[in-house]
Design a protein with these regions (language model features):
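Alpha-helical substrate-binding/gating segment
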Residues: 151-154, 172-194, 201-224
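Short, cationic motifs built from Arg/Lys/His that form the positively charged side of catalytic pockets
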Residues: 125, 147, 195-201
Length: 224
């Protein structure tokens, strides 16, 4: 919205919050797996490009309920791509994950490193990437897939931030301790190749990630 784009948001609000929706954006409550919903949205609005965030994303949950991840993530991508082809929309930016790589062979991970997901979440995202590749070859859709880990942070004025119930993300859990909402934080692992044996993690700030998606939209617009 701040870049001057006309934004249309589609969310079933299972984990989303209307309070985070910019009032200048047009909002539809709907599910990506509902073809009739996508057809109505694509008919009522002049859509130039799609930015796809609609996925389940908890690694642990994906191990106990992989069906949920293949249904929402993979089937959702199928319904979306079919709707895009029907309506002549040929650009998509996809929120993927570094979990597509599995256990990295080297640090930092390079884009062309081998992809060997170790959980259904990462596997579902890799399948979604491959779906875009083949639809691109068959129907001319241009796509960008962004693989990242550990998005964190909040907007600078604090009006929008992480909001999960129950909370599962590390940084919000840590902040609950000084706020008196949690007695302590537990750090798991003691055999990593680090000075104290605990795990190292890297993070990307959500505002940087938002900028990356805006830049990624321009890539297929320029013919990439």
């Amino acid at each position: 919205v701040e870049k001057g784009e006309d934004v249309v948001i589609v969310d079933n609000l299972q984990t989303g919050d209307m309070g985070a929706v910019n009032p200048k954006a047009k909002f539809y409550k709907g599910d990506i797996r509902e073809a009739e919903v996508l057809d109505r949205i694509f008919t009522e609005n002049k859509i130039d490009a799609v930015v796809h965030f609609a996925s389940n994303s908890l690694v642990g949950e994906s191990m106990t309920n992989p069906r949920k991840y293949f249904n929402n993530n993979v089937y959702g991508m199928q319904v979306l791509l079919e709707a895009m082809v029907r309506h002549g929309i040929d650009k998509i930016v996809f929120s993927s994950t570094a979990a597509t790589y599995g256990e990295p062979e080297r640090i930092p991970i390079m884009e062309d490193d081998r992809t060997e997901p170790t959980n259904p979440y990462g596997q579902s995202k890799l399948i979604m990437e491959k779906m875009m590749k083949w639809v691109s070859l068959a129907n001319g859709i241009r796509y960008v897939s962004l693989r990242y880990f550990n998005a964190a942070g909040a907007i600078e004025d604090g009006s929008i931030g992480e909001d999960h119930s129950p909370e599962t993300h590390l940084i919000p859990l840590i902040l609950q301790v000084p706020l008196g909402k949690r007695d302590h934080i537990t750090v798991f692992g003691e055999d990593y190749p680090t000075p104290d044996g605990t795990c190292l993690r890297d993070y990307i700030h959500v505002l940087d990630l938002a900028d990356a998606h805006v830049l990624a939209i321009d890539y297929p617009r320029r013919g990439g």
